[in-house]
Structure formats: structure tokens, C-alpha cells
Amino acid sequence: MRACPDRSSALALLKKYNAEPFHIQHALTVEGVMRWYAAELGHADEADFWATVGLLHDVDFEKWPEEHCKKAPELLAEIGCSDEFIHAVCSHGYGLCSDVEPTAEMEKVLFAADELTGLIGAAARMRPSKSCQDMELSSLKKKFKDKKFAAGCSRDVIREGAERLGWTLDELLEKTILAMRSCEDSVNEAMAAL
């Protein structure tokens, strides 16, 4: 079992450096998505590690957007995160704001899913249900192809993430929809409690 900070310490660190509800919601979503992927890919015993990396992956973004993935090691050290944990967090910005390459399976999942959760979340907000529970792959693929929709979500990074995992783009899209369905209610409950 990999060492990681307990959830309450991780959440406190996230909230110390992030006040915007959007950033908190994104962190909680990526946490849930990473937990789902850990179980799905046969790493249930590492689910807490995967999820906590997801929770803290953007810990430095709100206050230091120009130093994203560069300020994170200092902040993560505040709660005693291991070098392995810090490497995983920093690897999600590979090629954009970090030279730390995602090499472990968990890092590749984070790299691929981070941008994609933003796209799926934006697509869900456009649906009558405001939810990804009834989202179909075909609907997401249309949004993916529309470069003007959720333009801040890099399609190139999402494609590269699928390639790094050895998956088709459709596999990544479909799995991440399922992952977001699994945590949508708990994320909404947590946001309502803020």
C-alpha cells in the first residue's frame, strides 16, 4: 500500500490554497474519478493513493497559475507527501507546465482524465438533466469534436492520454463517463455542504 496523506489533511491543504468553488469541485471530481479507475484497473488496494493524488493535483493552480506544477511540491511537503506522490501530481502537467513525464499507470490515468473531466462536466451542464448520469458516448463525442465547446479542455492532451494508456479515444471517453457517474452525487453533496 502506497503512503499518502489522510483525506482530512489533504482536503484541508486543498482548501487552504483554493477558495473558488469551481476549483474545489474539479478536485473532488478528479478524486472520485481516480478512485473509480483504481478499482476498475485492479488497484483497489491503492485507491486512497490514486484518489488523494486526484484531490490534490491542482493544489497550486488557483493561487499560482503561472507556477502550476512547480509550486505544488512545496505545498505538498507541508503535509508530508512522499516523492512518489509529488511526482504523480506534477506529471499531470507534462508538456504544458511540467517536464515530469507520466510513467506509472496511475499517472497516465490522471494525465488523460484531468482534462476530460472538464469536458464531461461542461457537457453535463448543457444537458436538461445537468448530469452525466444520462450522458451517452455519442453525445460526448460530438462535444469533443466541437473545438469551440469547452475550448479550454485540450483535446490533444486527452488524445495523448488515451495513447499513453494504450486505449482508443472511445475507451477513455466511455470509462471516464462511468467514473464521473460513480462520484457525481457525492461531489454534489460535498459542494452543497460548503
Regions found by a protein language model. Give the residues of each.
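Conserved active-site and cofactor/substrate-binding residues in soluble primary-metabolism enzymes
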Residues: 5, 9, 25-29, 67, ...
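Divalent metal-dependent catalytic cores for phosphoryl transfer on phosphate-bearing substrates
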Residues: 43-149, 159
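Acidic/His-rich, divalent-metal-binding segments that scaffold phosphate/diphosphate chemistry
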Residues: 1-64
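A structured, mid-to-C-terminal "fold-capping" secondary-structure block
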Residues: 133-135, 139-194
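Predominant activation on well-ordered alpha-helical scaffold segments within soluble catalytic domains
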Residues: 11, 28-35, 70-73, 120-123, ...
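Charged/polar positions within long, soluble alpha-helices
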Residues: 39, 121-124, 185, 189-192
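Short polybasic/polar patches that bind polyanions
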Residues: 15, 35, 39, 77, ...
